[in-house]
Amino acid sequence: MERHEKKTLSKQEKRSFIKRIGSRMVKRKVSINVCNADLFLTKIMSNTLNRTSNSTEEIKTPLSLEIFKKEYDKFQPGECSQKPFGIIKSYAYNTYHGLIKEENEDKYLIVPHIKKPTNGNVRTWPKMSLFGIFDGHGGESCANYLKDNFLSCLLEDKNFPVDIKLSLQGTLERLETDFHKKFNSDEKNPRDVSGSCALIALIVDNKIYLANIGDSRAILSLENGTKYRPITIDHKPNNPKEYERIIKAGGKVYIDNDDPIRDINKVIIINNEKEFDAHLKDPEVVYRIYPCDLAVSGTIGGVKAKSKELNAVPGCISSNCEIFVFDNNNSNDFIIMGCDGIYDCLSNKDLVDTAWFAVNKLGKEKKYDINKVSLDMCNMIIKNSMDKLSADNLTVIIIGLDGLEKYLHNKINKEKIGNMIKENSKE
């Protein structure tokens, strides 16, 4: 298995992992691999990681491999494109249940070419591609529903493809309504309490549209990785705008203090902006919304977090999407779409650096094939997330653009010139 060099985990990284296990899964009653979690925690607490606390000897095997070798062995490479389409020079994707969870509630949607419906009334049909990540919680039903129905709902939207922003907004609103009607029309006795975040990339000719509900994220690498920028904004209670919206709706935001009873009287309530700003500087703080206990403030579905009949505060959890639009240009390298399991342990910079590490480290042996290189980027991001002990499902999509294609072409040309010089010097 191709791996990059990594350092031994710091104490802060270990504490962060323990906190993520405790606050995000065990207490949420999510199905986890208890053996892995217990083994890890036991080794941490008993300090039996092949060295004493005073020893300077490095662990020979990376900690995540030592504890979770079986999970690494199960990891399978994802899939990638075979040819370009429109402005998309390549794409690749992969998803994995991760080190701790037994089930993968993440779903993805890949439609390289949206074909014109036979009954379509639009004369000119643009080149369009669709990519989506649906990060489920409380079960797989909602994420599966979005995956299975998003494209058909989009094609049926009255504004599509004339007004893309309205089409994306209308599609997500319809999916929220339809899922609720199908599974939870009787709010007192819901048949399915699952919910899902939604991150959509729709490429239309030379324009790129990103629609987001929840805490999955898309970032753009620019100018051969020397720059990057987040495209979407996370819908979480640590977002000041989301915090303000939740409070206005009548909800509360609190800091998860690892209290398994979830007694609202024993947690730290954030009462004002001053307290909010003070805690925001602590990377270990996990914000949650009371009374639904979610750490994300935007989802499709999730009736228990939205229905007054089930003691929720309506309006705290939103199903409204944000849409971001930009034109493609030669400086755009690629888009990375990822679920929160990736971003919980890798910063935006970490993510871009990992992707470019794969390009430069593994590209040569793949003969700088943009499709295979894009897949290496996906796989390495997931492996790096496991190295950082992400405790969640892991899903990544890479969309290669002009900048990446040109960079790889330059690599190929330099290699050809280098080989020619070597041959001439022999003569």
Task: For the regions a language model picked out, list residue spans one by one.
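PP2C/PPM-type serine/threonine phosphatase catalytic domain
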Residues: M1-E427
